[in-house]
């Protein structure tokens, strides 16, 4: 029974190479891609889609085959009874094989996506009304979701120019401690870090633990981009993997949605190694698994079990785009730090005279590039913009040309 919906998967060895299928502009416009048609210029002219966190690539053939097989098998109703155990096992095995984290399948819970998991954590596990700490710049919903549950947000702007990281970004641990002293009950961690592209090192995670452990607080660790580490010299380390004292205060959320470009089919996994925290979760979240999409979950299983060869090629494409941008911006006043992970990149325009418009508005109106407004990722970042580089090489070139044309 557990093979249903997966029977069409091609079997690749780790040495196999697959071809990544890139979508053309015309295809993306014709299909009404939100990324490419959701933002136009003020006069209605089309833009280059660089704002939504998805890739301009077809998903892995293994994933597509699994989803097509599920449709052929009629798996369009409610979740089959074997689905949650199967995704739990695939998630645990992937975490162990890819990152060395020895997760047991019994510690994995199926949810629709990372954001509902965050909402459930805030609503049910955090003390009512206490502040939520968000290191910034941050994924936009992290700054808005706490307010839906009557929790104020404490933004902690991150540090630049540390000795260890050069121009890279680092958590402001003293700022986080100050927020915890003020009564905060949760720290939202994003690793790899959207939008700055940092992959946090083990010593950074241990230093964060030393701060959080002094207080009655939890960590929500969003690891949705963990499979997209671009710098092969930087290992990904999950915060909760570092020991029982880490796991005891951590809700870890991950998914295949970003790494295999299936975000429109909601399916994510919460990992809870700590038994006491897992029991608290199960009291209120037992039914959350029903919100996960069956087709998306089967796609995630295929991604975790058979999708790594395809993803290696995807990361090569993204790295090539990053190389292009890094070279092009090297002698310009634009602040760009090469991402260690994720295809989302963070561009600073503080040293550029763009006139009265924000960077994102200027990019849209003058370069016809749709990017994210920096101020939506943190109050201190009005002079920044987030740009997605998971695109065809020619699109990356056009983004660079458009940006350089503003100088």
Question: Would you name each region that the model predicts?
Answer:
Residues 15-113, 120, 303-306, 407:
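N-terminal small-domain helix-loop-helix segment of the aminotransferase-like
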């Amino acid at each position: 029974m557990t093979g249903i919906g997966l029977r069409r998967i091609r079997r690749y060895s780790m040495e196999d190479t697959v071809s990544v299928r890139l979508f053309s502009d015309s295809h993306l416009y014709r299909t009404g891609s939100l990324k490419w048609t959701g933002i136009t210029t003020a006069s209605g002219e089309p833009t280059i889609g660089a704002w939504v966190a998805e890739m301009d690539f077809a998903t892995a053939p293994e994933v597509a085959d699994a989803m097509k097989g599920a449709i052929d098998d009629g798996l369009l109703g409610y979740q089959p009874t074997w689905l949650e155990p199967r995704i739990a096992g695939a998630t645990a095995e992937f975490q162990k094989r890819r990152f060395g984290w020895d997760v047991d399948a019994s510690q994995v819970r199926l949810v629709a996506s990372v954001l509902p998991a965050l909402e459930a954590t805030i609503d049910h596990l955090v003390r009512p009304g206490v502040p939520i700490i968000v290191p910034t710049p941050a994924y936009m919903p992290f700054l808005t979701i706490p307010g839906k549950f009557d929790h104020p947000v404490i933004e902690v702007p991150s540090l630049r120019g540390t000795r260890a990281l050069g121009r890279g970004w680092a958590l402001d641990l003293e700022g986080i401690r100050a927020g915890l002293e003020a009564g905060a009950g949760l720290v939202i961690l994003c690793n790899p870090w959207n939008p700055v592209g940092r992959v946090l090192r083990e010593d950074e995670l241990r230093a964060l633990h030393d701060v959080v452990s002094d207080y009655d607080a939890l960590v929500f660790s969003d690891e949705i981009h963990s499979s997209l580490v671009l710098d092969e010299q930087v290992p990904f380390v999950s915060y909760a993997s570092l020991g029982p004292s880490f796991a005891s205060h951590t809700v870890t959320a991950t998914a295949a949605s970003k790494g295999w470009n299936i975000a429109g089919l909601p399916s994510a996994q919460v990992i809870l190694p700590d038994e006491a925290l897992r029991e608290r979760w199960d009291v209120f979240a037992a039914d959350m698994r029903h919100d996960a999409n069956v087709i998306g979950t089967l796609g995630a299983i295929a991604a975790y079990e058979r999708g790594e060869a395809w993803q290696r090629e995807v990361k090569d494409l993204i790295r090539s785009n990053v190389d292009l941008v890094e070279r092009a911006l090297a002698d310009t006043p634009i602040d760009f730090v090469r991402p260690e992970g994720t295809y989302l990149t963070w561009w600073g325009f503080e040293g550029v005279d763009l006139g009265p418009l924000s960077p994102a508005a200027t990019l849209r109106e003058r370069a016809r590039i749709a990017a994210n407004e920096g101020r939506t990722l943190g109050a201190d970042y009005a002079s920044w913009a987030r740009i997605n580089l998971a695109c065809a090489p020619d699109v990356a070139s056009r983004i660079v040309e458009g940006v350089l044309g503003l100088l």
